[in-house]
């Protein structure tokens, strides 16, 4: 994914026009969110499980802390918690960088790049030719379970000339291939993003190498989609069960560059039907289609090849919407915490819901629990707890007109405040006093999401706190806000308060998170 804002920020850095940052003993490196070993990272690529190993590929500059020299970085894990850094998987070479794409298993060796005894794993990516700034689609393969990758000698598999009838930008805006095998039609499907045209194109192949255009999904064909949502990038597509029914539906997930609830880029998902050639979108509801109302959730993709015995659709995104501006010196960009994505009815509406994967419980320890306790205005709870890596869960019944506030990373003059305002059913994250916000005009302010009480009047909030981030999950996961924060080391306090009325705390669980 090539973002014009990123290019601008790279120039600012090259000119030495970076903003000052406060000193940090660990350079703000997260405790349990993935970061590259060093240098630049943007969105995840090619997420796939091979055997017992989860593979994370990501857009990476292995030589500098700014966007450029883009290749596929690589890390592996057996639990999605502890990551081992691996050598570059798909390198930039001969003036062609390796932009975003996806991976898939080729069990019947349709590509001919393995053999029947050892079928290959395939990775499709966008080749970005630096000299012309044009983009085409390319293929790499692995015959050693994803440890190493070889570029296909016949690249590109979709050239700019083949794209031309469907791309009015002359090869400048065709990228981020999502590829999967469509069981119903027996074909391989590729979904390409055309950011300059606000559309996706759908292609089919019998052998994963030779591709035929089939259809376009344009913004004008999606009933209810605002014309302000522009710059489509990083598509994903999959079937998702509708909880509580025997049905499944097709889902298209993508990252527009503009139009998100928090401003700028964000991730949305739409449901619809797919016949093997074209996707027909259901009418969208602007109040439920966005997967995150925070500023820092970009370029989400899902892991594939997850066994049916697991059954989860797990997604992750990059947490950074500010290019090279954040005040870190040895790294830029971090992965959101992996979360499950499901589709269910909440109240009277169908919602996408997300929850942190349960593996988080294996690396956390309870610090304090409360049950069936009423908090009143003037009280402060949890103030004895200190921590910069926490998992905080609060379930409560709010009085009419009350506002429950949870301050995290709290210090003498710093705090990030998560609030629930009962009168308008609003969940919010306030970064106004969160620490260093000078690095970007969008780094401060308040982000909000609608969160209704359940049928019994209960509100549930879960907050993942890390060195430089908060990720908030409201209700069953229908309201999510992910934001970067940059407080000082000493701002490690916690405070739970209420104003405007009481709140009955059904349960509170504060857990310390550590990979050690």
Curated annotation (Swiss-Prot):
Residues 1-23 form the signal peptide. It catalyses: Endohydrolysis of (2->1)-beta-D-fructosidic linkages in inulin. GO terms for molecular function: inulinase activity; sucrose alpha-glucosidase activity. Its main location: secreted. Substrate binds at residues 40-43, 59, 67, 99-100, 175-176, 233. It comes from the Eukaryota. The active site is at residue 43. Coiled coil: none annotated. It is an enzyme of class 3 (hydrolase). Plays an important role in biofuel production. Pure nonhydrolyzed inulin can be directly converted to ethanol in a simultaneous saccharification and fermentation process when combining A.niger and S.cerevisiae. Endoinulinase can digest fructooligosaccharides with high degree of polymerization (DP) values (>20) into short molecules that may be readily hydrolyzed by S.cerevisiae SUC2. Thus, introduction of an endoinulinase gene into S.cerevisiae will improve its inulin utilization and ethanol fermentation through collaboration between the heterologous endoinulinase and the invertase SUC2. InterPro entries: ConA-like_dom_sf, Glyco_hydro_32, Glyco_hydro_32_C, Glyco_hydro_32_N, Glyco_hydro_beta-prop_sf. GO terms for cellular component: cytoplasm; extracellular region. One of its GO terms (biological process) is carbohydrate metabolic process. SUPFAM superfamilies: Arabinanase/levansucrase/invertase, Concanavalin A-like lectins/glucanases. Its EC number is 3.2.1.7. It is found in: Secreted. SMART domains: Glyco_32. Keywords: Carbohydrate metabolism, Glycoprotein, Glycosidase, Hydrolase, Polysaccharide degradation, Secreted, Signal. Induction: Expression is induced in presence of sucrose or inulin and controlled by the catabolite repressor creA and by the inulinolytic genes regulator inuR. Belongs to the glycosyl hydrolase 32 family. Endo-inulinase involved in utilization of the plant storage polymer inulin, consisting of fructooligosaccharides with a degree of polymerization (DP) value from 2 to 60. This is Extracellular endo-inulinase inuA. It comes from Aspergillus niger (strain ATCC MYA-4892 / CBS 513.88 / FGSC A1513). The gene is inuA.
